[in-house]
Amino acid sequence: MTAVAPRVDGHVAPQRPEPTGHARKGSKAWLMMTTTDHKQLGIMYIIMSFSFFFLGGLMALLIRAELFTPGLQFLSNEQFNQLFTMHGTVMLLLYGTPIVWGFANYVLPLQIGAPDVAFPRLNAFGFWITTVGGVAMLTGFLTPGGAADFGWTMYSPLSDAIHSPGLGSDMWIVGVGATGIGSVASAINMLTTILCLRAPGMTMFRMPIFTWNIFVVSVLALLIFPLLLAAALGVLYDRKLGGHLYDPANGGSLLWQHLFWFFGHPEVYVLALPFFGIVSEIIPVFSRKPMFGYVGLIFATLSIGALSMAVWAHHMFVTGAVLLPFFSFMTFLISVPTGVKFFNWVGTMWKGHITWETPMIWSVGFMATFLFGGLTGIMLASPPLDFHLADSYFLIAHFHYTLFGTVVFASCAGVYFWFPKMTGRMMDERLGKIHFWLTFVGFHGTFLIQHWVGNMGMPRRYADYLDSDGFTIYNQISTVFSFLLGLSVIPFIWNVFKSWRYGELVTVDDPWGYGNSLEWATSCPPPRHNFASLPRIRSERPAFELHYPHMIERMRAEAHTGHHDDINAPELGTAPALASDSSR
């Protein structure tokens, strides 16, 4: 079904009150520190996450600069170890995970018609303890022994008090625990909000795909983050109280790997699934079509969540202590529901009236990049290939294609998509496209070539290599493109600041024109409790039906949903005007 008809709902543009500027000095900072509004906390999460992302990117540039030529340039081996440890930690636990809760905080209550999250104070606690945990980890750089240097996977015995005796390592472990507590708090909040605060008519199978994905991610987070916290406390117990939980002499090294990866691989899907949801919200809007295979997408998400708990040991093939056929088969199997998602995304775009606004470009960039990462993941699921490629730069390339391709591309798509809803202003399309192409070219130039150098045998986590190894030209190409990737954040930062202050004002509920979920049925930005009134929810596309009531009968007929008895239900009447007045 293609929707191209003009609006006929008598829409009234909302009045946007401008700030007077008469508040006391410092009052904004105090309100920010004490707020429990899910929208403000969502924006704070996103800003905090991108701040850590920029810092982690600087660490990555130092790593790539060191590897530009053979020999140690300006970093010692110890400093190199600290940088790749903190780079991985910052990107995964201080950027990738918090930005999930940032988008969830802002968008999810709006999508289900809730006035706020279920536990506003717990929400604020989760944000601040995550921030404090991140600062604690990074403060390790200021300690005498430097920051943690045992890798973000914290393998034993590298993480014991003998091999990593510094205070920075202890602060890293405490910081990991704090960020884990913040994620558990957010997961409890999102899960309870979804189950208890949905608007009338918002059944589970009328929820947006993004909300469904956050639901599954919250369940996963409640299963895995307490395990990470307990395992990390065990490391602290060994370091400070002389325990032997992870002593290699009694198999403790393998125990740690099992505990860590039982957390670590589901965590990959905690990072990925929300961004699958973001892309699933964007593609229908700019394809002018409903999501193809809505129910199939939901069951694919549920399947990925379930299977993600059964594949952790594919990270341990080279230990020789896991059942190779089982974990290899499960890893191959989890690619099936992921393939279903790609099929649905492509099916949504098929014969649609596609327009290439910035959010859509980022979404297609996500699809291309993540698809390549998924294909190399299938290669690594084969034990014979994994034996050859383990701990090489092939693994680094696969990991970045999978996570950078998912988290960065889709989070940028989400920012460009929901920025008008958050701020009431449009972002600059030209700067957004410059940002995309610099990122796309810089990323693929940096990491595509690492597949080849990894296959040639270059190991990861080495600060140096020999000229005779033949790795030099590959590393130089990768480093040059990495600096292009680093430069790509400049138009993004400028776009955000420029648009926040001077961007085109949004005077309608749905600036994209074809939004489906409920956040597009209230003003930009929404009022304190989100809605003055809610439209009737009769499908998974309530905002579209609100703005295009003349198409409801056609949508029901083409969707074959069996809800034809709703066609003759009372019309929406003045609901559009009420929704538009929600900024008063």
Swiss-Prot record:
Gene Ontology CC terms, in alphabetical order: plasma membrane
Chain segments annotated as transmembrane: 43-63, 90-110, 122-142, 171-191, 214-234, 259-279, 292-312, 316-336, 360-380, 399-419, 434-454, 477-497
Annotated localization: Cell membrane
Catalysed reactions, as listed in the record: 4 Fe(II)-[cytochrome c] + O2 + 8 H(+)(in) = 4 Fe(III)-[cytochrome c] + 2 H2O + 4 H(+)(out)
Domain of life the protein comes from: Bacteria
Sequence position, cross-link 1'-histidyl-3'-tyrosine (His-Tyr): 265-269
Named cofactor requirement(s): Cu(2+); heme
Record-given protein name: Cytochrome c oxidase subunit 1
